[in-house]
Amino acid sequence: MDTMIDIKGLSIDELERFLLGKGKERYRARQIFKWLYQRGATSFAEMTDLAKELRRDLEETARISTLSPEALEISRDGTRKYLFRLDDGCSVESVLIPEEDRNTLCISSQVGCAMACEFCLTGTFRLTRNLTTAEIVNQVCAVQRDVPVRNIVFMGMGEPLANLDNVIRALQIMLHDDGLQFSTRRITVSTAGLVPEMERLGRSVTVNLAVSLNATTDELRDRIMPINRKYPLAVLLDACRRFPLPGRRKITIEYVLLGGVNDTLDDAKRLVRLLSDIPSKINLIPFNEHEGCSFRSPSQDAIDRFHRYLLDKHFTVITRSSRGADISAACGQLKGKLDALKPSGAGKQIEVSDSTNEVT
């Protein structure tokens, strides 16, 4: 059994305590963080401003994990889907969405998902396990070696707030000045609506929050999102009102438009009433059809009508284009399996590594 500490699984405070336990100076933690996250060091030998004695000690008691993509698929629209094989054979996917002025990376927090949302392909796979802090952070590090990343969204495989300890620790690494140096404005954590964990997230770190709402009545949300039976709309929306928002930031409300299910004008009217006193902006996401799911994409008329009504009521609203759908990288299509990356005429597949164990 591997008893060595994965150094990339530690927050700066935990790394300081680890070093203090060895009789070393606290400031060494900041030096190590910079080597890991700003210089991309993969061995302690590279950390030349550390004393040789400390480097030898670290080599004997700690390790630096890495991830390399086992496969990469590139969409016609430039979206890049990375498949990472973890050290226990499990796999997860991350998606890079390119824009003119920024790249947004969508990362995973779990292998599979227990939320069982009816419209989400990931939800059809049972939850296998939580990702470790290092596995979350290493998705960002791996993609940054390939292309620059400006924004991070926790909207990949899994429910981030169901893995809150590791997600918070990963966020602390991403936000730290000696870590990955992301701005709090550039990171968004999405949730299906785990209310107690929303409150703890708000107390622990300052990041943007996205709530996957998708219905305007408890009857419908109970059916398509089972978590609603535990935390119904009134409870969830009250938690949104209490969530600490710095400055003039708003909660992002994600609303997947399901054809003939939740895309009517009456749905739009109820949504406006529900959000009337919550600082929010709305992302409309036309459903991406996938095999084995009975839901259908909404008509363009229904999308336009819904969008216009929200605009007329002075909401900030964006209808998201379906990026990466030709390589099953669009919202709700991630499944973390090699069979998701079979070559097709639509996307280009690039095999990056034949290894089945990418964590070292």
Curated annotation (Swiss-Prot):
Residues annotated as catalytic: 93 (proton acceptor), 331 (s-methylcysteine intermediate)
Gene responsible for this protein: rlmN
Keyword flag Ribonucleoprotein: no
Role description: Specifically methylates position 2 of adenine 2503 in 23S rRNA and position 2 of adenine 37 in tRNAs. m2A2503 modification seems to play a crucial role in the proofreading step occurring at the peptidyl transferase center and thus would serve to optimize ribosomal fidelity.
Cofactor entry: [4Fe-4S] cluster
Family, similarity comment: Belongs to the radical SAM superfamily. RlmN family.
Record-given protein name: Dual-specificity RNA methyltransferase RlmN
Name of the top EC class for this enzyme: transferase
Taxonomic classification: Bacteria, Pseudomonadati, Thermodesulfobacteriota, Desulfuromonadia, Geobacterales
Entry-linked Pfam families: Radical_SAM, RlmN_N
Domain of life the protein comes from: Bacteria
Catalytic activity: adenosine(2503) in 23S rRNA + 2 reduced [2Fe-2S]-[ferredoxin] + 2 S-adenosyl-L-methionine = 2-methyladenosine(2503) in 23S rRNA + 5'-deoxyadenosine + L-methionine + 2 oxidized [2Fe-2S]-[ferredoxin] + S-adenosyl-L-homocysteine; adenosine(37) in tRNA + 2 reduced [2Fe-2S]-[ferredoxin] + 2 S-adenosyl-L-methionine = 2-methyladenosine(37) in tRNA + 5'-deoxyadenosine + L-methionine + 2 oxidized [2Fe-2S]-[ferredoxin] + S-adenosyl-L-homocysteine
Co-factor remark: Binds 1 [4Fe-4S] cluster. The cluster is coordinated with 3 cysteines and an exchangeable S-adenosyl-L-methionine.
EC code(s) of this entry: 2.1.1.192
Gene3D superfamilies, per the entry: 1.10.150.530, Aldolase class I (3.20.20.70)
InterPro entries membership: Aldolase_TIM, Methyltransferase_A, RlmN_N, RNA_MTrfase_RlmN, rRNA_lsu_MTrfase_RlmN/Cfr, rSAM
Disulphide-bridged cysteine pairs: 106-331
Single biological process term from Gene Ontology: tRNA methylation
Note: Reaction proceeds by a ping-pong mechanism involving intermediate methylation of a conserved cysteine residue.
Predominant localisation class: cytoplasm
Residues covered by the Radical SAM core domain: 99-326
Alphabetic keyword roster: 4Fe-4S, Cytoplasm, Disulfide bond, Iron, Iron-sulfur, Metal-binding, Methyltransferase, rRNA processing, S-adenosyl-L-methionine, Transferase, tRNA processing
Localization of this protein: Cytoplasm
Annotated positions binding S-adenosyl-L-methionine: 158-159, 190, 212-214, 288
Positions bound to [4Fe-4S] cluster: 113, 117, 120
A molecular function (GO) term: rRNA (adenine(2503)-C2-)-methyltransferase activity
Gene Ontology terms: cellular component: cytoplasm
